[in-house]
Amino acid sequence: IFNLSYTQAMLVQFCFFTAYALMSIPAGKLVEKIGYKGGVIGGFLIAAFGCILFYPAASSASYPIFLGALFILATGIVLLQVAGNPYVTLLAKPGKESATLTLIQAFNSLATTIAPPLGAAMIFVDANASLAERISSVQMPYLGLAGFMILLAVTVAMIKLPDARQIAQAETEHNHDGKTSVWQYKHMVLGAVGIFCYVGGEVAIGSMMVNVLEKVAGLDHEKAANYLALYWGGAMVGRFAGTFIMDKVKANQLLAFNASVAGALIVLAIVSGGKVAMWSLLAIGLFNSIMFPTIFSLGTHGLGKYTSQASGIICSAIVGGALIPVAQGAFADTIGLLPAYFVSAICYAYIVFFALKGYKVDEKTA
């Protein structure tokens, strides 16, 4: 429908991550008022509205309207993340927060793995198709997705769920830490930096993977795209496996191990090149698997009534997915494709620090 330059095409990613930067903290304050369940319902409805707006965007062939619809859709996803992630951790059994959230995130990874080929089959049409056919191929899937999200919102509204705000308030009364601001929790701030580094590193590696597979491993574009699925699919496998591993290993210890291995794989890729670099970088997807849910649960642990605000702050750090890839790309232009991966290696080094020391709750809070 649109004939876009590379810069215009990149506005899609920019709009998506900008929603996290701008809307996460307001979403946290909203959840504080309407509750976690209300936030989940609202997230589904806002996302559905964004999907509906793709209909007029396609009809008018207006890219600005398309970007506006995408921003609204992303805002709904932000609210879902801000409300849903802490909701899961607050309702989980004590000590099982990371494992429970990892299991939930595993289904997210499952959707991420199967959605691209499914979406491509539904949306992409023959190159010789008429404009009307191309417009319809975009409109109908998004209307269907909007209907599905509305159905989910109604389902959540009908299910009787506990008020997690009461659990959070009880946690605050039990701790008696005397803190008057969410920013006084050092482990929360360090956790937000951890999310910034994790999402940035993950997206940077994934975004440049096809270039590595083509220029370093010598694959053609089609094969490179197929191999890329292994990177994202590894996250799905790792999350399902991580759920059970966390029954035996402490969450922070598993996080430290995974981040250390990911960093080591990057170093191996840089010094080796060729197929060794290819398989090393693809394997990182497996070790990325448990990082987001584990960093999130450790960063929001013991915050009580401040949990919703903390969730907003931590989710705003997802903007790292827009900034760190740009930095790594700039280094790739100057020092080379593989050497530029040192940027992602630094991200994983920070995550190791957070997993070993930064996650610890202040003694007054414990």
Kindly give the residue locations of the regions a language model identified:
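Central cavity-lining transmembrane alpha-helices of secondary-active solute carriers
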Residues: L11-K29, A229-A241, G320
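Extracytoplasmic gate region of multi-pass secondary transporters
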Residues: A115, T180-A229
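Helix-to-loop junctions at the C-terminal end of transmembrane segments
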Residues: M23-Y36, I123, G238-K250, A332
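C-terminal ends and interior cores of transmembrane alpha-helices
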Residues: L45-S60, S260-G273
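Intracellular juxtamembrane helix-capping segments at the cytosolic ends
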Residues: L79-K93, S289-G304
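Helix-loop-helix hairpin linking two adjacent transmembrane segments in secondary transporters
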Residues: P94-G95, A99-L161
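Hydrophobic core of transmembrane alpha-helices in multi-pass small-molecule transporters
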Residues: Y63-L80, V276-I290
